[in-house]
């Protein structure tokens, strides 16, 4: 039985992880990490700890859905107490991503901006479409609930990277995050990423390929956050058997 520690237990996905782990086979919840206290009751056999080392020692693998600053703390602690990590936290900055890569030299880490099977497949389709539809303009629109803090979403940026790599482009040089005023004509290499926020939308991503006379839109809609929690549990079961290294959700799903 693989023992899982949940980091970010008070968050939306963290709470779902705890519920979904109760129904999982060959994998169980052993510990949760909180900065102050847990917002809800939990099985007394599960360790609830504010001490990072105790939390890590009580589990075989960690699933993280927290905030970038908290994820950074986890990575720094895991370097000293290596554990396989499934990281679903989005909005990581360059320093935090470098820390993640450094940590993966000593432990297996699966990092994904979206844990769903559908988005993993969408990334592959976007890469293929981008390569095949040369001359088509690429625009990406993402929609999320009004409480989401980072924009654009990590998923949208991953999709943009897939589109850019399909054409051999450097996303940092062609990405557009917004348009306003008299900006002139659209550059043919532009990949625009737009973010909308409102209501309780779990997540919707649309990647459009637009040409004169026709267009194609690929989209994915998440209707429940259980998609992310179940995907993370599947990833944890897979990662527990792996050697040190940095893995993606596509590696796990063999897409």
UniProtKB/Swiss-Prot annotation:
SUPFAM superfamilies, per the entry: Glyceraldehyde-3-phosphate dehydrogenase-like, C-terminal domain, NAD(P)-binding Rossmann-fold domains
Main localization of the protein described in the UniProt heading: cytoplasm
Q: Which Pfam families match?
A: DapB_C (PF05173), DapB_N (PF01113)
Q: Which reaction does it catalyse?
A: (S)-2,3,4,5-tetrahydrodipicolinate + NAD(+) + H2O = (2S,4S)-4-hydroxy-2,3,4,5-tetrahydrodipicolinate + NADH + H(+); (S)-2,3,4,5-tetrahydrodipicolinate + NADP(+) + H2O = (2S,4S)-4-hydroxy-2,3,4,5-tetrahydrodipicolinate + NADPH + H(+)
Question: Which keywords belong to this entry?
Answer: Amino-acid biosynthesis, Cytoplasm, Diaminopimelate biosynthesis, Lysine biosynthesis, NAD, NADP, Oxidoreductase
Q: Among its keywords, does the record have Secreted?
A: no
Chain positions recorded as (S)-2,3,4,5-tetrahydrodipicolinate binding sites: 145, 154-155
First-tier enzyme category under EC? oxidoreductase
Give the record's family classification: Belongs to the DapB family.
What does the function comment of this entry state?
Catalyzes the conversion of 4-hydroxy-tetrahydrodipicolinate (HTPA) to tetrahydrodipicolinate.
Name of the featured protein: 4-hydroxy-tetrahydrodipicolinate reductase
Q: Which organism is it from?
A: Sulfurimonas denitrificans (strain ATCC 33889 / DSM 1251)
């Amino acid at each position: 039985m693989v023992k899982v520690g949940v980091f970010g237990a008070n968050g939306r996905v963290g709470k779902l992880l705890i519920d979904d782990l109760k129904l999982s086979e060959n994998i169980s919840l052993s510990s949760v990490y909180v900065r102050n206290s847990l917002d809800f009751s939990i099985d007394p056999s599960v360790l609830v700890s504010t001490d990072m080392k105790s939390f890590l020692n009580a589990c075989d693998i960690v699933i993280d859905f927290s905030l970038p600053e908290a994820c950074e703390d986890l990575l720094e602690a895991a370097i000293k107490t290596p554990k396989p990590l499934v990281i679903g936290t989005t909005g990581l900055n360059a320093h935090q991503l470098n820390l993640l890569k450094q940590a993966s030299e000593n432990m297996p880490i699966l990092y994904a901006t979206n844990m769903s099977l559908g988005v993993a497949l969408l990334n592959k389709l976007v890469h293929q479409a981008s390569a095949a539809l040369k001359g088509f303009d690429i625009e990406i629109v993402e929609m999320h609930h009004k409480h989401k803090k980072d924009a654009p979403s990590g998923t949208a940026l991953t999709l943009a990277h897939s589109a850019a790599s399909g054409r051999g482009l450097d996303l940092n040089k062609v990405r557009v995050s917004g348009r306003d005023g008299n900006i002139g004509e659209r550059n043919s290499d532009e990949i625009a990423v737009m973010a909308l926020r409102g209501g309780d939308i779990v997540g919707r991503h649309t990647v459009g390929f637009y040409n004169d006379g026709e267009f194609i839109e690929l989209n994915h809609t998440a209707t429940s956050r259980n998609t992310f929690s179940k995907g993370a549990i599947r990833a944890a079961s897979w990662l527990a058997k792996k050697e040190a290294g940095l893995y993606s959700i596509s590696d796990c799903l063999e897409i």
